[in-house]
Amino acid sequence: ELIALAKEKNVNFLFEASVGGGIPIIRPLNSCLTADVIEEITGILNGTTNYMLTKMSVEGSEFADVLKDAQDKGYAEKDPTADVEGFDACRKIAILTSLVCGQQVDFNDIHTEGITKISATDIKYAKAMGKAIKLLATSRKVGESYCAMVSPCMLPQEHPLYPVNDVFNAIFVHGNVLGDAMFYGSGAGKLPTASAVVADMVEIAKFKDTNLPMEWRPEKLELADYKMVTNRFFVRTKADEAAVKNAFGAVEFVAAEGVNGELGFVTEEMTEAAYEEKAAKLADILQMIRVK
């Protein structure tokens, strides 16, 4: 609505700071990468949750303890719901998806999971597998549409987002011509955010009587069903090995130091729908985290 109004009035509405704080990503997607079909955007888009997950990994702390620490340091709000439930990252991936597809993406249509269920035990399993748990916001091109999701994921050490820690953000972009690119930097804080805001003000002043084109039409994009996307899944359960194999078939069992009285395993790659069908056959599932 605001973009259309700006075009009508021959002025500009810019919002670089809305995603990634001081990281330039809106302008690159809107201008530098317009020759590409953007096939994937995957990002760590919330500094608060990234700080919390980093601290849980380094110290072995539980969620409640790192949340209090983040609040004491001013990284998390008194009501942290938007951050820890993934809503902030969801709105940001909706903005980026709208930019690359040129249509309106409703964040309410994006499947979103936060980090409130992540525990110190999950971190132990991730470390045993040589992985790190990150809250990822992902959008992938599926046919003529996109599929978007926000959820915690286990990343291997070779993934470009694996070393992104603390309050930093990073956005991985794959284009059909460009290939892979990554944008990294301070995703929050008054000075990084001010840098992006002032840059927009300078851009507006430079093009005072010209409307800079931005392809974002009001027509709503119907997102592809996330349940058709494939992943591997890490699962913790109280069930025994026979029950696990009966439900999921071939799996890779994982042992974590200091964890007893349960099983951890990684499934073969399958759709979300297939996982849900198999999980319904297994009692006492304690946790599920997607594995990249």
Regions found by a protein language model. Name each.
Residues 201-292:
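A conserved regulatory-domain signal marking ACT and ACT-like small-molecule sensing domains
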Residues 1-31:
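Rossmann-fold NAD(P)-binding glycine/threonine-rich loop
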Residues 6, 70, 126, 245-248, ...:
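A generic structural signal for well-ordered alpha-helical segments
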